[in-house]
C-alpha cells in the first residue's frame, strides 16, 4: 500500500477590497478608542473652566481653608440671621455678581464661592471636591447666620441641590438646572459611551426627592446648553408642593442674568 499523502491547503486569500475595508475598520476603531481615552483623560477640562477673580477687593474676600485647598469666597457682610450662598457656573467669575446681589438682597449676608482653581482658590476642581467645599462653606456660614438660602447656577445647581439635601438650608434656588451632567454630556457626545467614561456625573435627580424646603427652578426660554426637557425631568423628581418651575422669556443660558426678571424672581423666592 502506498502511504497517504497529506496535501497542504493554501491559505485563504482576500480580495484587495476586503483588505482595504479591514484596514479602514481597524484604523477607525483605533481612532475611536483613542478619542474615548482622550475624552476620559480631559473630561474635567471640558467641565471646569476656571476664571480669574476680576471684581473682588481685599475687603470683599475671605479665605476658607479646607483639606487640600484654600478657597476664596467673595463676601458682603451683613449682621443678622439671613445669608445667601451662591454656587456659580462652570466658567463663571462669581465675584461679578457681588454688586448686583448686594443691591438685590440687602438683608442677606452674601457668600459667593470660587471653586477650586477659580478666582484664586487653590486645588483642582472635581465633583467630590466641590460638594465637600460647599458643605464646609455652609457650616462656616451657619455658625453666624442660621437662615441660609442656597442659590446655584448651571453647574452649581448640582452642587446646590446636594448641599440642600444634607444641610438645614431655608430655601433653594436653581438657575438653569439640569437632571444630570451625564445626561447633558450624552447629548453632546452621542457616539461615545459617556456613562462609562464620565467620572463627575452630577446626578441632581438623586438629591431632589430629599429636598424639603421651598425650591425655585429658574429656566431660560432659549437655553442652548441645558435642554428644557432636562430641567423638566429634574422638576418632576421633587416631592409634590416643594418645587416650582419659572421660565424667563427671551433669554438664553448665559444671558438669563441680564433679564430684569432674574433677580426679581430670586428675591421673591427668598
Residues covered by each model-derived region:
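Catalytic histidine-centered segment of alpha/beta-hydrolase-like enzymes
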Residues: 251-261
Amino acid at each position: 500500500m502506498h502511504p497517504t499523502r497529506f496535501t497542504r491547503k493554501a491559505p485563504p486569500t482576500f480580495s484587495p477590497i476586503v483588505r482595504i475595508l479591514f484596514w479602514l475598520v481597524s484604523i477607525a476603531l483605533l481612532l475611536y478608542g483613542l478619542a474615548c481615552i482622550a475624552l476620559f483623560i480631559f473630561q474635567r477640562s471640558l467641565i471646569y473652566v476656571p476664571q480669574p477673580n476680576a471684581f473682588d477687593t481685599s475687603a470683599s474676600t475671605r479665605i476658607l481653608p479646607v483639606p487640600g485647598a484654600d478657597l476664596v469666597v467673595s463676601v458682603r457682610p451683613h449682621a443678622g440671621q439671613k445669608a445667601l450662598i451662591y454656587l456659580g457656573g462652570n466658567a463663571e467669575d462669581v465675584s461679578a455678581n457681588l454688586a448686583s446681589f448686594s443691591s438685590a438682597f440687602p438683608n442677606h449676608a452674601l457668600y459667593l464661592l470660587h471653586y477650586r482653581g477659580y478666582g484664586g482658590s487653590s486645588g483642582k476642581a472635581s465633583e467630590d471636591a466641590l460638594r465637600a467645599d460647599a458643605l464646609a462653606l455652609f457650616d462656616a456660614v451657619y455658625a453666624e447666620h442660621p437662615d441660609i438660602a442656597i442659590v446655584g447656577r448651571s453647574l452649581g445647581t448640582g452642587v446646590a441641590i446636594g448641599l440642600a439635601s444634607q444641610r438645614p438650608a431655608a430655601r433653594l434656588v436653581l438657575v438653569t438646572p439640569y437632571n444630570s451632567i451625564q445626561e447633558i454630556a450624552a447629548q453632546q457626545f452621542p457616539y461615545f459611551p459617556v456613562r462609562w467614561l464620565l467620572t463627575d456625573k452630577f446626578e441632581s435627580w438623586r438629591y431632589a426627592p430629599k429636598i424639603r424646603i421651598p425650591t425655585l427652578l429658574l429656566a431660560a426660554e432659549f437655553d442652548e446648553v441645558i435642554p428644557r426637557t432636562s430641567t423638566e425631568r429634574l422638576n418632576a423628581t421633587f416631592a409634590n408642593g416643594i418645587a416650582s418651575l419659572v421660565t424667563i422669556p427671551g433669554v438664553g443660558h448665559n444671558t438669563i442674568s441680564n433679564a430684569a426678571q432674574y433677580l426679581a424672581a430670586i428675591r421673591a423666592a427668598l
